[in-house]
Amino acid sequence: MATITAHVSLAPVARRAPAAAAPCAPLLHPAGAQVILGATDDALGMAAPVVPSAKSMFGPRGVCAAADGSFWVSDTGHHRVLGWRRLPEADGTPADILLGQPPFDREGRNAGGNANEDTMNVPTGIAVCGRDGAGLAVADAWNHRVLIWHRRPTQSYQRPDVVVGQSDFDGGQSNRGHSQPDAGTLFWPYCVAWDGERLWVADTGNRRVLMWNGLPQINGQPADLIIGQD
């Protein structure tokens, strides 16, 4: 059965110092897309088989660019994150860094096994984070957790430093298997954001937003603020 090949489009922009509350460089350009990632030819945007590789994507849902020039994509359908050390300047530039799967040609929820510090299950939101803008946060939605690197990965398979939403990296149940949520649990977190001082997570399945003052430092750290529920 044919699937839809997804593209991520971006435009080169002049480098400039980022604002403290928004460390990502802008991606959009008024002239339209200048670079296409996810396929070598824009014509492949129609039905085509999606085979995992350093160039392909399947249903990417999150993207961010850091002030150091690195570029990151949540390749949601392949259950992985792709990273480029520098903002790509040519169509079809292969990714340099792979997170969530063993090699580039493999895919599957939690790499075909259970949740751990090396796997992902429907990663969606992604954001540069940390007061110095050096970190990375990924909303690993169907593992009901957010993965945090205090320093962005510089090589493939680099493990996250902290997980929130679960008590450890081996947990993968919604609300940690409890019948009710609390300040330390998540259920389908689909979006994550950093405002320069606080981490925000859209806890979609629990119909609320959670906030942490500063970047969480320990696994399972509870949120400091809950919006949307009592």
Which residue ranges define each predicted feature?
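Gly/Pro-rich loop segments of beta-rich domains
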Residues: 18-59, 87-124, 152-188, 215-230
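Structural WD40 beta-propeller signal
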Residues: 66, 129-131, 195
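Conserved beta-propeller blade signature
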Residues: 70-73, 135-138, 198-201
